[in-house]
Amino acid sequence: MKFPETHPVVLGTVTTPSGLRFLARKKLPADAVEVRVDALLAGKVPAEKIEAALRTKKHPVLLTLRIPAEGGQLAWKVAQRRELFLKLLPHVEAIDVELATVRAMQPVIDEARRTGKNVVLSAHAIQKPATPAQIARWVGRFEPLPATILKIAGRIRSWRDLQQLAALLVNHPGWPLAVMGLGPYAAQSRAVLTALGSRLVYGYLDQPAAPGQPSAAEVRKMALAVKLTK
């Protein structure tokens, strides 16, 4: 099983114990599933149960162990996070690692690339819109490598904030970028940014994993409309 190569890839997020059941379903309103391990562990789901669900999956999986500073629900110790990443890595097709933790998680990234997994390097502005300087730093730290995507998610409070995110896609047309908005305008931003070429678009399968996140079914319709107009 491989991570989808066509785009936009619709990712259905799973953050709850009941949501793990989606992994074994034959049909989903998504091309792949993002498993938010931090949220599951915070919800008292044992790591062993997560691993067991991954063993029965019928869809490609993006594995995310998010840190609190970027929207995660569990305060990790570095060694604990690294160990769990490596334990679950054989059962997934892609991983998400924050740009801020690349150095600490480098062994995980190296192993993912060695075993043919996709890597999403992410950055998030959760509480307030990202500044131009912040975005420039994120872009400056990214090296476009095979099977690697830069994901930037920023809070949107105005059309100017959306324009700033859209400019990322317009100014880097050949880059593997996934760009999305957070907050009250999240759904509208996904429509605009997907149309501009965002490689990934997220929607929840069980409950929202980020502020304003629409459902995977809504996102699927949006992505289909974009594909039909290309």
Residue positions per predicted region:
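Conserved N-terminal beta1-alpha1 strand-loop-helix module at the mouth
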Residues: 1-70
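Catalytic beta/alpha-barrel core
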Residues: 13-15, 32-43, 64, 85, ...
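Short, acidic/polar
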Residues: 14-28, 76-87, 131-141
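Acidic (Asp/Glu)-rich catalytic clusters
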Residues: 23-29, 44-58, 83-90, 106-116, ...
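Glycine-enriched alpha-helix->loop->beta-strand junction motifs that scaffold or abut catalytic
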Residues: 29-32, 89-94, 109-121, 143-149, ...
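Active-site-adjacent beta->alpha loops and helix N-cap segments on the catalytic face
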Residues: 40-56, 99-115, 130-133, 157-171, ...
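Structural motif corresponding to the early beta-alpha repeats
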Residues: 60-86
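C-terminal alpha-helical cap/extension of soluble enzyme domains
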Residues: 169-230
